[in-house]
Amino acid sequence: MQFRDLSADDIEVRVQSVKDTGCVLLLYKNARCDMNILDETVGCMNWKREHCRDNANCIVSIWDEKKEQWISKEDTGTESNTEAEKGLASDSFKRACFNWGIGRELYTAPFIWIPAGNVQINNKKTFDKFSVEKIKVENKRITGLSIINETLKKRVFLWMKEEK
């Protein structure tokens, strides 16, 4: 089973750390993205999710018509800082979907450093919002990426994988 690559609209950007000289960004997908891709690819009636171990684990199962049985993949999540139980369930679901291959290209993202001139920093904090402008994926690997600082309304990161 092959899931489509993530589009720029599927990917969210968050600030991982801030220094006086700039900030580091991370790319991620949310649970709604996974649900949408599962619905698109296998149909809304052909997949299911189950949580166990107090939401720490999630099992994502897809119906295999040829085998006439559910095929399952499972993973464990971690609590979020805001809503522990909901965050745990969401994280375990997203991780189980990574096991199916949804969004696995995010593991190949480059290091994203935004220098201080492209982000508003005050006391080693920023409230700037960022988004993926464009992404290019080849063979499940990110080969091109551009990021916009939505607050400043400008492109702040542009990267293309070097040809070998």
Regions found by a protein language model. Give the residues of each.
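N-terminal, Lys/Arg- and Ser/Thr-rich interaction peptides
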Residues: 1-24
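Positively charged, aromatic-enriched nucleic acid-contacting surfaces
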Residues: 31-164
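Flexible, active-site-adjacent loop/turn segments at secondary-structure boundaries
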Residues: 1-4, 26, 100, 104-105
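Short histidine-centered catalytic/ligand-binding loop motif
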Residues: 16-27, 76-83
